[in-house]
From Swiss-Prot:
It comes from the Eukaryota. PANTHER family: MENORIN (DENDRITIC BRANCHING PROTEIN), PROTEIN FAM151B. One of its GO terms (biological process) is photoreceptor cell development. It comes from Homo sapiens (Human). This is Protein FAM151B. One of its GO terms (cellular component) is extracellular space.
Amino acid sequence: MAASAGGPGSWSENILEYFLRNSQITAEDGAEITWYHAANHKAQTNEALKSTAHMIEADVLLPSDGSEHSQPIMAHPPETNSDNTLQEWLTEVMKSNKGIKLDFKSLAVVEPSMMLLENVKRHLKRPVWINADILPGPNGNSKVIDAKPFLDTVISFFPDVTFSLGWTTGWHPEKVNEGYSWTMVKEMEYICNELSQPVTFPVRAALVRQSCSQLLWLLKKSNRYSLTIWTGKNDNYSVEDLLYIRDHFDKKQVFYDILEPQNHEFKQAIGIKVNL
């Protein structure tokens, strides 16, 4: 367990402890945690809240009109508009007991979002993960968010939070895809070594197997660290790849935010019941 994870109901509480305490999972096993990904529009948010998912993941950006007073909205690039603002999203999510992961797509959206979160903090007694891609990763060509101002801004509002800090990545079906290099994991450790908060590293499923040595090294650096395996819609990876990860890493340190059909097949292979 993460030594510096917060106490019950804090934003940095380890999600396994939180959901065990609420009798929503049966073991300290990251594979038991279920996710609803991209709960951005109102329809998806409502579906996520009605679902059996433990954690709701959503994306926050500033709308494309660029006006000075624009409110943070819930959308994933290339979309730049939404029927849902962060404020409306939080109002709905507060009515549940689900954990939250907010993925920030620009530095500009962070401070106004933290101000909105500050207004509802007393109603959010659950894990809150704050995510950004802060380093270039394998085949990564999208813009990274500058780590220092991002971390400083979040911590100035909420020192007691869980960070999810990733690399920009790409995946190409027609060529050999390199994994996470030693340089990439060492750069990440250099940044996270200075933090006191729990940190999870979102890593792309199709790139993990060829990066096991590097990622095992990274996780051994602190008991505050974990991995969250995610998948691109068109990525080519097998359930065997997921089982390989399962066999080589501590079950308490790896979460799986993966798409169907692999999610179902993987859970079936390891004997975890899937509520569809």
